[in-house]
Amino acid sequence: IKQAIWKDAMLKSDEVRIKYASKYAGSSNYWKNSIGMNKGLANLKVIERKREEEAAFAAWVAQDAKRKEVYGDVLNLLEKGYTSSSEYKKISTYLGEAFLSGAEIVKLARMIQSVDVKGSTPEEIDIFLEDNIKPFFKDYDASLDQKVLAAMMKIVKERVPAENLPDIYKKVDKKYKGDYEKYAADVFKKTSILSYDNIASMLKDPKKYAKLKKDPAAELSLSVLISLFELQQLTGDSYYDIAKGERLYFAGLKEMYPEKALSSDANFTMRVSYGSIGGYRPYDAAWYDYYTTEKGIFEKENPESDEFWVQPEILDLIRSKNFGQYANKDGELQLCFLSNNDI
């Protein structure tokens, strides 16, 4: 929804297109990556393979009384944790995508709210403004974001249970009769944070900063954050069960397969990744080679699609086949390659 709103505005205005090109590409890439991952999970039958692994683990545990004592409840613990948290996780995702990653004014308000005005030096405030606020306004269009906010408010109301909606929805229902476009227009009309100078003045004056509590954008941001915090509280026990279950399950697998090298979860860590370059079989009777060449540019190039449009000069250069030392033995220009290592 956000991408469609952005795209429409980008097609109508070169200024907006330039401002939002990178943001749109990033959002689109994230969306397409999710589609690809889900497709990969299905095609590679990952869920079926994991179920087989769990069944083998359960059978192995059942063969020994000591194993039953240590690992007997592991799979139940994991199922309980994931089942009890899945709905809350979905709701948190809606709120996060719609507000923290959707309407940019909420992100802006959150950045400002995160500043410790009284505990920061003037130099620290200046650095914050230079590193965060100035870049924000460089590629921002308030009128476009207003449309996004209205759309995000609407979809959250449609998809999130009433008891988990941020409190701001009660105000919107009462004061604006559920008219999200009217509410969004009011937020953008009355907020004081759509000006770099206003923000700078606010952050350098604790008395002005205190008035931020009454700002409609800050009110929305705080309401969303409170809801996310409440959801986090509701999933605390579930995530404890998951963490405990994963720890015991991994320990059990290491015991079950002592000769097998099992990798630990290195997510969000600094790590060196090892792998190999190679082709890929996505489905029966199909094979993807390990590299692409310039031919693929012509096969995918589409002048009617802004995502697959290629500058005519680039196409002419490729047609000349003057690749010099970069050509392979067949005279092709190898461009990309596949590997199975993490990045």
Where are these regions (language model features)?
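Terminal presequence/propeptide segments associated with secretion/organelle targeting
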Residues: 1-343
